[in-house]
């Protein structure tokens, strides 16, 4: 990756255990990816019923289906890495056990209705339980309000896009990661293509990796242009490109022309090393009957390009 060198994880015994469980063959360093496209694929994970349930969960019009775990959904898609999003910290070791079969795991550290302090504490707790945990994800970090935060850098006051925890707490979180897990945990932050003003640049400079998403299907028509705008804010930043398989902004199945376009652009950006990989959204979409066309297209695309290598 571009921002800093990959460092190996400590704890040979723990990693040895990871190797024995991992169907994708965990190596000595979770932050070192192999040269195949598949190894650079992630999947955004939610428990079943989060987006495809009843009541508030039905707002996006996603059809109901039988439950499927995040690791099982990833296995179906042929994806080795998962970003787990659980707003209530899991208490059961039995729940966590299947995640040990993934090559890499990241866990949500911000967003939802739970406090940042609760979610951060859970991330640190999980480090002792998941030897393949290598990322803390700031989901829904920004509040996307028009009035910026005024932050005193000590050399002057700057305008920063408003967030759920504030810029000072973000910097403190960065310091804690550097002190407790330097080179072993990536701090990762979500940003959407709809919000690319200059005030977002100070926050985007803090994480190791940015997760770039296009919420509304029709906006994928301008994916290249929007990604270029993002790059102007965060040049050289390690970036995973989010691949939605449902039109959440439109609350409907994703138009297949847009699905094909976003994967064509994603492949182009990846091969040019403008992005580091992909995040497919999301695990509750995987087991629909009939299957969602965008999901099956993505699955076939991953299989087709799994062994692609960049020059």
Task: Describe these PLM feature segments.
Residues 5-25:
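N-terminal export signals
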């Amino acid at each position: 990756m571009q921002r800093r060198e990959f460092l190996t994880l400590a704890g040979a015994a723990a990693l040895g255990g990871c190797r024995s469980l991992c169907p994708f063959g965990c190596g000595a360093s979770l932050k070192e990816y192999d040269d195949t496209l598949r190894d650079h694929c992630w999947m955004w994970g939610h428990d079943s019923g989060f987006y495809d349930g009843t009541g508030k969960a039905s707002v996006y019009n996603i059809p109901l289906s039988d439950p499927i775990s995040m690791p099982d959904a990833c296995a179906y898609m042929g994806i080795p890495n998962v970003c787990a999003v659980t707003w209530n910290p899991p208490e059961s070791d039995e729940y966590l056990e299947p995640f040990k079969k993934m090559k890499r795991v990241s866990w949500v550290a911000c967003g939802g209705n739970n406090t940042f302090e609760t979610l951060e504490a859970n991330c640190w707790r999980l480090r002792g339980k998941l030897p393949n945990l290598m990322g803390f994800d700031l989901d829904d970090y920004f509040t996307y309000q028009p009035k910026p935060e005024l932050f005193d850098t000590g050399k002057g006051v700057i305008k920063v896009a408003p967030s759920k925890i504030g810029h000072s707490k973000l910097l403190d979180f960065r310091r804690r990661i550097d002190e407790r897990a330097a080179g072993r945990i990536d701090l990762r932050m979500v940003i959407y293509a709809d919000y690319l003003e200059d005030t977002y640049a100070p926050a985007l400079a803090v994480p190791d990796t940015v997760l770039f998403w296009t919420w509304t299907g029709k906006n994928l028509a301008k994916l290249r242009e929007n990604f270029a705008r993002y790059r102007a804010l965060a040049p050289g930043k390690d970036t995973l490109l989010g691949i939605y398989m449902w039109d959440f902004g439109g609350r409907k199945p994703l138009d297949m022309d847009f699905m094909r376009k976003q994967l064509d652009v994603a492949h182009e950006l990846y091969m040019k090393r403008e992005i580091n990989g992909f995040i497919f959204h999301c695990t509750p979409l995987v087991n629909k009957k009939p299957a969602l066309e965008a999901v099956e297209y993505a699955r076939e695309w991953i299989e087709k390009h799994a062994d692609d290598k960049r020059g």
